Structure formats: C-alpha cells, structure tokens
Amino acid sequence: MKIWCAVCDKEEASVFCCADEAALCNGCDRHVHFANKLAGKHLRFSLTSPTFKDAPLCDICGERRALLFCQEDRAILCRECDIPIHQANEHTKKHNRFLLTGVKISASPSAYPRASNSNSAAAFGRAKTRPKSVSSEVPSSASNEVFTSSSSTTTSNCYYGIEENYHHVSDSGSGSGCTGSISEYLMETLPGWRVEDLLEHPSCVSYEDNIITNNNNSESYRVYDGSSQFHHQGFWDHKPFS
C-alpha cells in the first residue's frame, strides 16, 4: 500500500512536510520548497515504505498483519479483529478508522539543499557589481585645462604676494598688481577703511595706534589687539583681566 502525493496525486510520496501537513513526491517537493527562503525552512521528514517482513502486526491477536488504525481505540487491527469489535454496538460503529499503509516516517528532519539561497546569493553578487559611471571619467585634456589655466596661476600669485606683504618681506615687483586689485576691492566693499590697518600684524600695533577711523562718518572704533586688556568704548569701562 502506497501514499500518493497530495499535490499531483500521480506519484508516490517521499517526504512529509509538517508546515504544509502534506505528503509530497520528489518533484513537487522541489517545486514547492525551493520557491523562496521561507518555504525552504519547512521541516520535512522522509517516508520509508516497509517490506512485507517489517509490516506491523495486529494489537489484538498479534499474529496477522494490521490493516486498520482506530483513532478512538488507539490501536492497529487486522481485518479479522476489526469486524467483531466495531460491529458490536452503535458506539463502536462510529469510530474513525484509517487504512494502515505501514509507511514509516524518519525520526529527524532531512537536510535538503536550498537552491533558493544559492540563487539569492548569486543575484546579490550581481547587484553589488555596478558598472563604472561614465560621468566619473574625466578626460585628461579637460583636467589639464582646469589645473593649468592662467586664472589659477594668477590667483596663486596673488595669495603669495599678500602673504609676503603681510610679513613685510615681499619683493619690489612681486604681486604688486594683485595686491592693488585686492586693495581696490576691499576699498569698494568697505568704504572708509584703510587696508594697511587691516593687514598690519596685531602685535606691532600699540594701544594708541589701535584706532581705525571712518573718514565718511568721522567716527573712531577701537580694535582688540590681543593684549591682556579690554578696549571698549562708550559705557563699558577699561578693565584688565581678573
């Protein structure tokens, strides 16, 4: 006696799935449980068909091969013992009895390869490999034009001239044009302010000279020179650090 597949009903079942509560053949098992990762985690037990010698014996007589299983009596019965027991009265006739196939189920779940995991890993590996972006590749000619342009060279010379002028060590002709253009820009942005006072080092300025005059409004402002004194104007007092 065989157990047929619960899906196709054409082949003999080889595994039993506890989650699906169904017996499946090999083909239907691969089709159902290799579909996704969740289905691949279902516990499946192998089914083994017994030989004639391994067939179970009747629990009543213990001599003949058992063919039925009674759910209420919790016993396997042969044909000769089943008839007199379940035909005795109306209560025993209502017992649920099932055909006994003798198929044994394995004690531990079987290990099956998970094709879905390998496919997912391959897909993940393909997803991680991204093609190089065309926009990230900059032609060498364009990069040379950017870094060797005349404007960048002029700007670097201007900064170099300002640094030398700040430390009072600039040459006579070095960066004069750049310093003049920046001075004009500062005079236009901050009208009435002297650029020499802004570029002069704070340590070289005394307290009396540390006053910047606004020619337009005839107002004087005190600038903090980095010493240990506060220089304020108006209602604030001139006090040293405590």
From Swiss-Prot:
Localization of this protein: Nucleus
GO molecular function: DNA-binding transcription factor activity; transcription cis-regulatory region binding; zinc ion binding
Residues that coordinate or bind Zn(2+) 2: 58, 61, 81, 91
Classification via InterPro entries: B-box_zinc_finger, CONSTANS-like_Bbox1, Znf_B-box
Gene3D superfamilies in alphabetical order: Classic Zinc Finger
Subunit annotation: Interacts with MED25 and COP1.
Modification note: COP1-mediated ubiquitination and subsequent proteasomal degradation of BBX20 occurs in the dark.
Any single biological process term in GO: positive regulation of photomorphogenesis
Keywords: Metal-binding, Nucleus, Repeat, Transcription, Transcription regulation, Ubl conjugation, Zinc, Zinc-finger
Binding sites annotated in the UniProt record for Zn(2+) 1: 5, 8, 28, 33
Transmembrane segments: none
Name assigned to this protein: B-box zinc finger protein 20
Region annotated Disordered, chain positions: 112-153
Source organism, top-level taxon: Eukaryota
Nucleus as UniProt keyword: yes
Organism phylogeny: Eukaryota, Viridiplantae, Streptophyta, Embryophyta, Tracheophyta
Compositional bias annotation for Low complexity: 133-153
One GO CC term on file: nucleus
ZnF region ranges: B box-type: 5-47, 58-100
